[in-house]
């Protein structure tokens, strides 16, 4: 974890501190040890090779969530801005039953996507009694704009993230352009949860048998409009 200190130009004093983490790789070999480290042993991530029916038929079930790593977060923001503006104009409010937090930690979107997925399936799986469970219980009592700070100040979870980030096969880029979001089944509804967005977005019905297929259909617009094929997806499924 790194703190970037920014000076106040007028007084020459420290005005703010920004928390920066190492970026996670979209790789089960990084994500699964992270879950074990934070006390979650009931689920694991597996690669989603393709969204075609043949590839999906080999995925374990039930499928609880999907983590999607997108290229070029700036273009993603441009694509999503009018969608959220329309939802706001329609007075759509964040669903009370969906756990969500605003991301204030740079490069931490992989862990935010994972934590959003885990937090919203606690009624379906055993999340254990480790550091994630303890953090989640505390985070539930805070506002969505306070939960990121709670995570940033949790030395155990920060260390677990850092260890997982260093497991990746790729070198850390100078500027991280990829961005993780998650799709999760909450009470039979598929939600898209993006820690850079203002609130979770309901997409329609889903189930443990069809979640990855449904999520694949939902994210198709990204794949069609981004001039980049560097996508990666992982499904969250029962641990073998």
Task: Describe the function of each predicted region.
Residues 2-240:
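Cysteine-dependent deubiquitinase/ubiquitin-like isopeptidase catalytic cores across multiple families
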């Amino acid at each position: 974890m790194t703190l970037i200190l920014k000076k106040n130009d007028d007084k020459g004093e420290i005005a703010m501190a920004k928390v920066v983490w190492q970026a996670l790789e979209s790789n089960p070999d990084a994500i699964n040890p992270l879950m074990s480290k934070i006390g979650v042993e009931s689920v694991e991530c597996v690669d989603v090779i393709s969204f075609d029916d043949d590839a999906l038929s080999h995925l374990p079930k039930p499928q609880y969530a999907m983590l999607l790593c997108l290229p070029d977060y700036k273009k993603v923001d441009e694509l999503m801005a009018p969608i959220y503006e329309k939802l706001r104009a329609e007075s759509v409010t964040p669903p009370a039953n969906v756990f969500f937090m605003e991301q204030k930690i740079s490069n931490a979107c992989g862990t935010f996507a994972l934590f959003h997925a885990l937090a919203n399936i606690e009624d379906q799986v055993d999340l254990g009694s480790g550091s994630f469970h303890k953090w989640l219980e505390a985070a539930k009592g805070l506002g969505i704009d306070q939960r990121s700070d709670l995570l940033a100040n949790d030395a155990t979870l920060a260390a677990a993230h850092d260890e997982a980030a260093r497991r990746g096969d790729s070198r850390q880029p100078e500027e991280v352009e990829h961005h993780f979001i998650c799709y999760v089944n909450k009470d039979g509804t598929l939600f898209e949860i993006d820690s850079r967005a203002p609130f979770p977005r309901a997409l329609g019905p889903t189930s443990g048998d069809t979640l990855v297929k449904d999520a694949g259909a939902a994210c198709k617009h990204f794949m069609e409009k981004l001039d980049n094929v560097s996508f990666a997806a992982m499904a969250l499924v029962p641990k073998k």
